[in-house]
Amino acid sequence: MGTTILAENGLLLQIALLSQFTVNGVGLITQTLVGNFKGKGESERIMPVLYTSIVHGLLISLPFAVLSVLFPVTVFGLLTSHIEVSYSIHAYVIWLVPLLSLTAVAFVLEGYFIGLKEGAILRNSALTALGMGYAPIAIAGWYFQSNHLLWTSLTIYMATLMFSLSLQILKNQQNYQSSLGQT
């Protein structure tokens, strides 16, 4: 794929990491509040925290992606002095929109399950996302030397993780509702 694509991927990952470190704060807040509400037995307050955290995570992550897509030469020009990289990155910068959106939601959902002390759910969801989402497409990306497939694999990993954790939330909510009906 070449050194230019390697440099472009490095720059795109810098934006992704900047967004993720920022959104991780929302995940930590979610973790703390969910854990506190669970400990106090105030389970009815957990879902509003989750919804609010997801919205705020997206509000934080999307500007990173949108600004990078709309002004790639300016944004990436701040990160590198190699003009050819700043000008050719436009082919891959669009991947930041789905990747950062999915990552924001996944980080918040991880915070939710950490707050509930459900480490097994996190582990199983991450392994599922790795095996079913990331690995097959990443292997194809390596085999075909396709950078778009590599970005697809990372995006699908986050989508699979988010979907898997979301299914567990629905299951938890059904269990919670049925326990309310029994009391």
Predicted regions and their residues:
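Short extramembrane helix-to-coil loop segments that connect adjacent transmembrane helices in Major
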Residues: 1-5
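Small-residue-rich hydrophobic transmembrane alpha-helices
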Residues: 8-66, 70, 106-117, 121
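Transmembrane helix-bundle signature of multi-pass membrane transporters/permeases
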Residues: 10-17, 53-54, 93-96, 126-130, ...
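Alpha-helical transmembrane segments of multi-pass membrane proteins
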Residues: 17-19, 83-109, 135
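Short runs within selected transmembrane alpha-helices of multi-pass transporters and secretion channels
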Residues: 24-27, 96-115, 121-133, 148-166
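Short alpha-helical transmembrane segments in multi-pass integral membrane proteins
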Residues: 34-99, 140-183
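Hydrophobic alpha-helical transmembrane segments in multi-pass integral membrane proteins
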Residues: 133-141
